[in-house]
């Protein structure tokens, strides 16, 4: 029934809106608006679905410990750390509620198909850009929300594996749609130079190839479509006679430099870390985040980040050894984990929600262990209430003015997104007040 999948539908609408570049005007920039829209989604998850959520004993202990350690440091946090903490709590609430919802509902294929088609539509405009590139040797933006090309690249990584899922389910007409969509998704990654997304997808396909025999022909066909896109990409550059874009770049995109810089700062305070949003706070010249989820947890959050990382590893291992989880779900999770190692997929709001949707889809297939029922669900409710109180406290005290500011925008620092579109921004301000 419709009422049993409301959160899934809301997230589907959120992603379609993000992909097609539509925004309602809550903020001047769509990126900032997508961040603001995460609040009602998280609040809905907290208020409506928490009564259905049960955490294992291990999860209860981990988040109780993280909560205690976080509480001892709250008075030392600045606005950037509160932004990062708020974002983490928001995503975990949505992930927990969505996992519970998907575990109890059946058919979600239609909603997934809508998201896939929405992601496919902007890719069609690559053809126009290719023609212009050949004729004028100038590349024109083809995305509907091209504030930064990397955002869209990470959004379609989990959507790529949803596409394979529907192909396996013999979803109507996807037999014809599948090769075209794969080709255009790959074309988007090649022209954007999205090495992280390409590595993530190919690794995910390798995992899918290993885990399932009956779909190995499908994997090889998919690789063929990707290779065809690569040939079109290289041919375009050849005919344009101007190699201005290439996925095979020799530069590092300053990833290694950022990692080394933050590592040197972290060595001075390894237990507490340098603080969430550290690069945004100091206006680091190469970017406002280090493009690596795992190093970010360790270097920025210290012991708290390490504990959370242990919990993540535990959940991933349990997911992969669970035979009830579909191979395509394991492949998609692998791709998300790889992409998070080199990109901002778990920083940008649209890619965050796309990844959370796929993770919830995968985790919802897991067979629940008996450890979930050893203790009363009252322990889980108390834990959620405490984290919910912290979530509301941060929202009111540190993000209240942003949520209540209609038509505002970020403006501080470079247009290198982090929590806000301009990553160095502490709070949104009315557009008329932007210098």
For each feature predicted by the language model, list its residue ranges:
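TM-adjacent membrane-interface loops and short helices in multi-pass inner/ER membrane proteins
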Residues: 256-288, 294, 301-308
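Aromatic-anchored transmembrane helix interface
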Residues: 35-41, 58-71, 78-100, 119-120, ...
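Flexible juxtamembrane loops connecting transmembrane helices in multi-pass membrane enzymes
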Residues: 225, 229-261, 281-284, 400-418
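Alpha-helical transmembrane segments of multi-pass inner-membrane proteins
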Residues: 39-45, 90-93, 107-136, 147-211, ...
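N-terminal signal-anchor transmembrane segment
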Residues: 1-50, 68-75, 129, 194, ...
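Hydrophobic transmembrane alpha-helices and their immediate junctions
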Residues: 4, 303-334
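Interfacial loop-to-transmembrane-helix boundary motif in multi-pass membrane proteins
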Residues: 3-12, 54-67, 89, 97-125, ...
């Amino acid at each position: 029934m419709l009422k049993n999948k409301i959160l899934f539908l809301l997230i589907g609408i959120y992603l379609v809106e993000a992909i097609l570049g539509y925004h309602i005007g809550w903020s001047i920039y769509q990126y900032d608006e997508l961040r603001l829209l995460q609040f009602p989604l998280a609040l809905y998850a907290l208020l409506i679905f928490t009564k259905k959520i049960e955490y294992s004993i291990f999860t209860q202990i981990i988040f109780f410990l993280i909560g205690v350690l976080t509480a001892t440091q709250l008075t030392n946090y600045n606005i950037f750390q509160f932004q990062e903490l708020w974002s983490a709590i928001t995503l975990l609430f949505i992930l927990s509620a969505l996992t519970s919802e998907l575990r109890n509902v059946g058919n979600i294929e239609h909603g997934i198909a809508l998201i896939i088609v929405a992601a496919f539509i902007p890719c069609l405009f690559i053809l126009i850009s290719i023609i212009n590139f050949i004729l004028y040797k100038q590349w024109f933006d083809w995305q509907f929300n091209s504030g930064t090309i990397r955002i869209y690249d990470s959004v379609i990584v989990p959507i790529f594996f949803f596409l394979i899922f529907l192909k396996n389910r013999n979803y109507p007409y996807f037999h014809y749609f599948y090769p075209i969509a794969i080709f255009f998704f790959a074309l988007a990654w090649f022209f954007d130079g999205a090495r992280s997304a390409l590595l993530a997808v190919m690794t995910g396909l390798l995992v899918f190839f290993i885990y399932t025999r009956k779909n190995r022909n499908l994997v090889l066909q998919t690789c063929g479509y990707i290779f065809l896109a690569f040939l079109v990409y290289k041919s375009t550059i050849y005919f344009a006679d101007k190699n201005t874009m290439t996925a095979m770049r020799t530069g590092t995109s300053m990833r290694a430099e950022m990692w080394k810089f933050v590592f040197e700062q972290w060595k001075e305070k390894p237990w507490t870390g340098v603080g969430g949003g550290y690069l945004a706070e100091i206006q680091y010249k190469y970017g406002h985040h280090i493009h690596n989820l795992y190093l970010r947890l360790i270097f920025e959050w210290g012991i708290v980040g390490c504990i959370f990382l242990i919990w993540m590893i535990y959940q991933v291992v349990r997911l992969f050894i669970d035979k009830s989880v579909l191979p395509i779900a394991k492949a998609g999770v692998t791709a998300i984990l790889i992409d998070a190692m080199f990109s901002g997929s778990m920083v940008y709001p649209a890619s965050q929600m796309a990844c959370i949707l796929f993770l919830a889809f995968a985790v919802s297939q897991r067979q629940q262990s008996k450890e979930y029922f050893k203790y009363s669900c009252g322990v889980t409710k108390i834990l959620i209430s405490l984290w919910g109180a912290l979530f509301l406290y941060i929202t009111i005290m540190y993000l209240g003015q942003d949520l209540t500011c209609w038509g505002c925008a970020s403006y501080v620092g470079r247009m290198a997104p982090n929590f806000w579109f301009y990553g160095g921004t502490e709070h949104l301000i009315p557009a008329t007040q932007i210098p």
